[in-house]
């Protein structure tokens, strides 16, 4: 995936957004930044992350003029897709993907993905430890607290990446294709975001949408 010279918006400047932005800069993108929190301390944040000192940063509201200039938007999982900024981007045809989807597009190895309402972190950690006994290079990432984009450059054809995937992350997956996936359980959760249990279930089940008969779920 060649993003050199592309103008890319990173929406949400927490851990995932920072990692995604850093990867995009390394890939030669023109990175722009947005956070909807009107209390966001622009000055302090840029001092903490000087790598983004030359990046335009919008707080609270995303200007229409900026929306028109974007060629891709990378959204942190904590940002609902029905927020005004995301709806603006989609309305003018800007592709919107999540941080994990962005990372996967640069993945060189195989992926094992785990989702579910409860037990994701424990299972992901355990699977990672087991695979480390069998494979020379294993990364454990995702909703477990380590952004996928922070390690994906290190992957090789010999790598196995074990990733914990939340329903929020699955909402913005397009090409994500794990060799092995697991849905642990599904009980009512995050209905303030998904609105209905049916939508929540669909989000979880979408972990398999790019899998084929050669894969395992």
Spans of model-derived segments:
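Phosphate-binding loop of NTP-binding sites
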Residues: 22-26, 65-68, 77-217
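N-terminal leader/targeting and accessory segments in enzymes
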Residues: 1-98, 102
């Amino acid at each position: 995936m060649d993003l050199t010279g592309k103008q890319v918006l990173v929406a949400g400047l927490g851990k995932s957004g920072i990692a995604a932005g850093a990867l995009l800069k390394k890939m030669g993108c023109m990175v722009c930044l947005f956070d909807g929190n009107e209390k966001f301390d622009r000055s302090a944040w840029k001092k903490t992350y000087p790598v983004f000192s030359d990046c335009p940063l919008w707080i609270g509201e995303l200007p229409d003029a900026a929306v028109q200039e974007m060629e891709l938007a990378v959204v942190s999982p904590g940002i609902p897709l029905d927020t005004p900024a995301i709806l603006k981007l989609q309305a003018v045809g800007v592709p919107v993907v999540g941080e994990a989807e962005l990372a996967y597009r640069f993945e060189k190895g195989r992926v094992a993905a785990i989702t579910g309402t409860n037990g994701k972190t424990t299972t992901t950690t355990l699977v990672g430890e087991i695979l480390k006994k069998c494979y020379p290079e294993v990364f454990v990432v995702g909703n477990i607290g380590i952004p996928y984009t922070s390690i994906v450059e290190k992957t090789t054809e010999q790598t196995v990446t074990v990733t914990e995937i939340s329903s929020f992350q699955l909402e913005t997956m397009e090409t994500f294709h794990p060799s092995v996936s697991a849905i642990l359980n599904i009980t009512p959760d995050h209905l303030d975001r998904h609105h209905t249990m049916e939508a929540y279930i669909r989000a979880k089940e979408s972990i398999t949408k790019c899998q084929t008969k050669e894969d395992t779920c």
